[in-house]
Design a protein with these regions (language model features):
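Pre-Walker A (P-loop) beta-loop-beta motif of ABC nucleotide-binding domains
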Residues: 22-33
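Conserved coupling/switch loops of ABC nucleotide-binding domains, chiefly the family-specific signature
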Residues: 56-59, 109, 209, 319
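The feature captures the beta-strand-to-loop junction immediately N-terminal to the Walker
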Residues: 35-37
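Helix-to-loop junction immediately C-terminal to a conserved catalytic motif
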Residues: 50
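Conserved ABC transporter NBD signature motif
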Residues: 58-66
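ABC ATPase nucleotide-binding domains
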Residues: 70-227
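Non-catalytic connector elements of ABC transporters
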Residues: 237, 249-332
Length: 332
C-alpha cells in the first residue's frame, strides 16, 4: 500500500501558521497534483511528507504507518527536486547509482537497476557522460532515474519542470505521465502551473494561504469550482468576474463568473462593449474589454472580425454564481 494520509496537519513558523489543519487522503498509485501560487504552502506540504520539515501538529501516514518521527531515509519515498541536484563530477551512471551505493546495495543489483532505469528513461547512450554534457530535459531524466532505482512507495516531485523551456516542459509532462503508468506507484507532484496540473493529475489539490480550497478531478475543478479562488486560478485567460447587478437586478449581492470561451458573439441577448486590447493566438483571438469596473476577456475564433466595440452574449447555463461576501459558489 502506497497511500498517503494527512490528518489535521499544521505547520507554524515563528508563531505564523503556514499550513492550517490540512486533511488529505492520497490513494495508492494515484497521481495527485498540489497547485497554487507561490507561498501557498504546497512545497511545505511536500517537504513534511518527505520528513524534510517537521510538522507542528497532526499526523502523516504512508501506507498504514505513522511517519511523524521517522527519518526521511526510512520513509520509503523518493524526492525529485526543481534543481535536479546532480553531482557534476559524476557520470550519469554514477549519479543514478549514488543512492543505492550509499545503502551498500551489491554491485550486480546496482548495475541491473541502473540499466533498467536508463532504458525506461531513454538514457542508455548517455550513461558515461557528465551532467554538463546533457540538455535540461536529459538532466531531469537523470534525476528521475536516481529516484526510480530506489523503487520507492511514493514519488515526491517539487516543480521538476520549471527550469525547462516551454517545448521541453510539454515533452516532459507526457514522459512523467508515462513513467507513472509504467511504475504504478503513488506520485505527489507540486507545481504553480495550472496547465501542468490539469494535464497531469488524476486529482488536483488547489491551495491558497495554507488552506485546501478544493480537491477533485481536473474536469470537476474546471467545470465545477467551489469558490471564486478556484474558479479564477484555473483557466487561461482566467474566469471573468462581474458584479451581478451590472448584468441584472436579480443578481444583486452576487458575483457572476463567466469563462472567456463562453463569451460568444451572435447570441439572442447581447450587449455592446468597447474593445480595449486584442491578442491573436494562432487559431484564437483574445479580446479584452470592461464591464463597469470589471476587466473581462472573451476567447473567440481567430476569424472573428473585431472593431472598436464588440457585442457579447452569454448562455444562462454558462453562468456561475458566487456569494459576494463568502466567495462560495451558489448552485441553482
Amino acid at each position: 500500500m502506497s497511500s498517503v494520509v494527512l490528518k489535521n496537519v499544521k505547520k507554524i513558523y515563528d508563531k505564523k501558521v503556514v499550513i492550517d489543519g490540512v486533511d488529505l487522503e492520497i490513494k495508492d498509485k494515484e497521481f495527485i497534483v498540489l497547485v497554487g501560487a507561490s507561498g501557498c504552502g504546497k512545497s511545505t506540504i511536500l517537504r513534511m511528507i518527505a520528513g524534510l520539515e517537521e510538522i507542528s501538529e497532526g499526523e502523516i501516514l504512508i501506507g498504514d504507518k505513522k511517519v511523524n518521527n521517522i527519518h526521511p531515509k526510512d520513509r520509503d519515498i523518493a524526492f525529485v527536486f526543481q534543481s535536479y541536484a546532480l553531482y557534476p563530477h559524476m557520470t550519469v551512471r554514477e549519479n543514478i547509482a549514488f543512492g543505492l551505493k550509499m545503502r551498500k546495495v551489491d554491485k550486480a543489483t546496482i548495475e541491473k537497476k541502473v540499466q533498467e532505469a536508463a532504458e525506461i528513461l531513454d538514457l542508455t547512450e548517455y550513461l558515461d557522460r557528465r551532467p554538463k554534457q546533457l540538455s535540461g530535459g536529459q538532466r531531469q531524466r537523470v534525476a528521475l532515474g536516481r529516484a526510480i532505482v530506489r523503487n520507492p512507495k511514493v514519488f515526491l516531485m517539487d516543480e521538476p519542470l520549471s527550469n525547462l523551456d516551454a517545448k521541453l516542459r510539454v515533452q516532459m509532462r507526457s514522459e512523467i505521465k508515462k513513467l507513472h503508468e509504467k511504475l504504478q506507484t503513488t506520485f505527489i507532484y507540486v507545481t504553480h502551473d495550472q496547465t501542468e496540473a490539469l494535464t497531469m493529475g488524476d486529482r488536483i489539490v488547489v491551495l491558497d494561504k495554507g488552506h485546501i480550497q478544493q480537491v477533485d478531478t481536473p474536469e470537476e475543478i474546471y467545470n465545477n469550482p467551489q469558490n471564486t479562488f478556484v474558479a479564477g486560478f484555473v483557466g487561461s485567460p482566467q474566469m471573468n468576474f462581474i458584479d451581478g447587478e451590472l448584468l441584472d437586478e436579480k443578481y444583486k449581492g452576487l458575483t457572476v463568473g463567466i469563462r472567456p470561451e463562453k463569451m460568444i458573439t451572435g447570441g439572442e441577448i447581447k450587449k455592446s462593449y468597447n474593445v480595449d486590447i486584442t491578442e491573436l493566438l494562432g487559431s484564437e483571438k483574445i479580446v479584452y474589454f470592461n464591464i463597469g469596473n470589471n476587466k473581462c476577456s472573451a476567447k473567440l475564433p481567430a476569424t472573428t472580425e473585431i472593431k472598436d466595440s464588440i457585442e457579447i452574449s452569454v448562455n444562462a447555463d454558462d453562468i456561475y454564481l458566487f456569494d459576494k461576501e463568502s466567495e462560495k459558489r451558489i448552485y441553482e
